[in-house]
């Protein structure tokens, strides 16, 4: 047990220590300052020349969003065409067939919005061609899209008064060539040394320890897993994700993959401070996020390492903790850490089955996604926190009788309306979606049965499975309580639309707020200015997040995870 806890502490220590210099480097990249990666400039110039883009041309917030949305629309069409025709495309040694239109819609939307929800099993539902030219490609592009959006907001904040927020295409390409690609190569090398396969051969015929013949899927796994983690994508090459021994072979590969999930989201907070020259603000935000993360880790590690009371009642020893749904080579502690790390971000990859975690652990996993502001996805995580800063500034200003201001710009009704809509959208789509699925189960069971039945677990846990699915979609996370039968028309289309709404409406709103504030006259700090980089304001922001984001979900948790906990 002590060794497992030491492993948890080591991984968190590595994250905190490395996120600071990486954040400084990211800020330099987006500012266009000299870095060690300048050797990539010829490649970047070639990309801009081929695409026909001038990277030095500044965009206003509307042009910025237009470019972002056009890019995503193009890749959606690209992905749909390849997925429904993959059975006839090259690099398919295992002869996997095409996806159905509803499954392709869900898959394409899911990977396009950085969610990576998988209603298929990777080794049988895709080919090597679509793994590389849809899945891996989207994992780079969607991560870079979120990072580019944050870079635009950082640029707008750093200027006193401006009508432009940078060039989307420039930020997008820099995110890929200077940040995501180098880190992916490092992590990929580590995985290859640990035994992760990298090749294009078909399934292997092997003889197991029992003397039975078995086929084992392989492929370009080591090329895809690093960006899966670093881009907070999470879509596994294999159906069981990083609990698969070829996707995550050893404890060292587990450390590398778990570290990869959170390092860029953590670094982006420091990048904000370096870019805007407001390190106190960055420390304040980082502190709130880190405290929330550590609280979640503490709860889940305790829950999983102390085992299941039902098994205790049977007189069975649980020296290694609750091992249901966990890999023996990794242990309960590493799985608990991963479960929080993957849900405080929009990653969603797993090294054990969340469906088998203790009820309160499942609640913490869901609350992380329902709050959706603790580090979050690369780029968009801080942007969600930015929404609550705007709300907290407005409320604080009203409480103390001061004009609401954020970094020298007045926060007025227009910005507040946008921020409120964004904040309320998240609980709305989760709770309405869950209510709809419960209604269909209760009042139209014939429809559910026609789709093969959804639930393998009735009662409290069955509600949790539906609740988790919509939560995961709305948070662009992609993990799931996999007792839910989700490859159906209802879940493919319902989740697909939740994914679209929950990805693009917040980004549009957050970039719009940044663009509107950037155009306003800069107001110098005075004795009456509400400081947003203090401990007091950090606590205020946390309170607003807890009240608006977390409390909305407690009635549903009372009927699902909490009720299940007290039934043990």
Regions found by a protein language model. Give the residues of each.
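Membrane-helix cytosolic exit motif
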Residues: 22, 303, 395, 437-440, ...
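C-terminal catalytic subdomain
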Residues: 387-391, 396, 400, 418-457, ...
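N-terminal alpha-helical transmembrane segments of multi-pass membrane transport
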Residues: 1-106, 161-162, 166, 170-207, ...
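Alpha-helical transmembrane segments
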Residues: 271-276, 398-412, 512-533
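A conserved hydrophobic secondary-structure block that centers on an alpha-helix together
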Residues: 126-200, 252-282
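Selective recognition of specific alpha-helical transmembrane segments in multi-pass small-molecule
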Residues: 68-82, 174-197, 261-264, 273, ...
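Hydrophobic alpha-helical transmembrane segments
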Residues: 66-76, 138-148, 257-269, 381-395, ...
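P-loop potassium selectivity filter motif centered on the GYG triad
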Residues: 90-134, 197-259, 312-380, 448-501, ...
């Amino acid at each position: 047990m002590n060794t497992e806890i030491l492993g948890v502490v080591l991984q968190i220590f590595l994250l905190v220590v490395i996120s600071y210099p990486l954040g400084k480097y990211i800020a330099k990249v987006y500012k266009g300052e000299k870095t060690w990666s300048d050797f990539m400039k010829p490649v970047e110039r070639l990309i801009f020349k081929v695409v026909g883009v001038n990277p030095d041309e500044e965009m206003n917030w509307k042009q910025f969003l237009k470019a972002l949305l056009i890019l995503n629309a193009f890749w959606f069409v690209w992905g749909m065409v390849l997925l429904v025709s993959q059975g006839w495309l090259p690099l398919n040694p295992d002869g996997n067939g095409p996806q159905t239109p509803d499954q392709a819609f869900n898959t394409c939307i899911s990977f396009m919005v950085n969610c990576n929800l998988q209603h298929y099993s990777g080794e049988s539902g895709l080919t090597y061609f679509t793994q590389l030219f849809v899945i891996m490609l989207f994992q780079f592009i969607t991560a870079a899209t979120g990072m580019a959006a944050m870079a635009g907001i950082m640029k707008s904040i750093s200027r006193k008064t401006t009508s432009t927020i940078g060039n989307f295409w420039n930020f997008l390409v820099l995110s890929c060539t200077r940040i995501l690609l180098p880190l992916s190569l490092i992590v990929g090398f580590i995985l290859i040394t640990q035994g992760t396969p990298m090749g294009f051969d078909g399934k292997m015929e092997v003889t197991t320890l029992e003397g039975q013949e078995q086929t084992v899927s392989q492929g370009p796994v080591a090329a895809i897993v690093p960006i899966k983690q670093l881009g907070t994508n999470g879509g596994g090459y294999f159906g069981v994700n990083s609990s698969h021994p070829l996707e995550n072979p050893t404890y060292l590969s587990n450390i590398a993959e778990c570290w990869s999930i959170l390092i860029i989201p953590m670094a982006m907070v420091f990048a904000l401070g370096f870019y805007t020259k407001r390190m106190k603000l960055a420390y304040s935000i980082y502190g709130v996020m880190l405290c929330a993360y550590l609280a979640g880790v503490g709860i889940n590690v305790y829950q999983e390492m102390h085992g299941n009371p039902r098994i205790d009642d049977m007189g069975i020893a649980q020296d290694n903790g609750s091992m249901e749904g966990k890999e023996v080579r990794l242990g309960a502690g590493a799985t608990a850490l991963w479960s929080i790390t993957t849900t405080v971000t929009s990653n969603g990859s797993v090294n054990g089955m969340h469906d088998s975690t203790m009820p309160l652990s499942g609640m913490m996993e869901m609350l992380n996604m329902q709050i959706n502001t603790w580090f979050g996805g690369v780029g968009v995580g801080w942007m969600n926190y930015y929404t609550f800063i705007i709300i907290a500034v407005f409320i604080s200003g009203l409480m103390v009788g001061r004009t609401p201001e954020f970094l020298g710009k007045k926060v007025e009704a227009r910005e507040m309306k946008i921020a409120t809509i964004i904040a309320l959208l998240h609980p709305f789509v989760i709770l309405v979606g869950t209510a709809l699925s419960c209604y269909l189960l209760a009042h139209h069971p014939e429809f559910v049965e026609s789709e093969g039945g959804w639930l393998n677990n009735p009662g409290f846990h069955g509600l949790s499975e539906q609740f988790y699915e919509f939560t995961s979609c709305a948070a662009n996370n992609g993990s799931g309580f996999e007792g839910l039968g989700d490859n159906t028309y209802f879940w493919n289309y319902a989740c697909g639309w939740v994914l679209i709404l929950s990805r693009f409406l917040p980004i549009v709103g957050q970039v719009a707020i940044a663009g509107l504030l950037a155009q306003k006259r800069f107001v110098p700090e005075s004795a009456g200015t509400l400081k947003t980089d203090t401990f007091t304001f950090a606590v205020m922001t946390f309170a607003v997040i807890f009240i608006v984001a977390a409390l909305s979900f407690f009635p549903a948790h009372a009927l699902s995870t909490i009720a299940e906990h007290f039934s043990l």
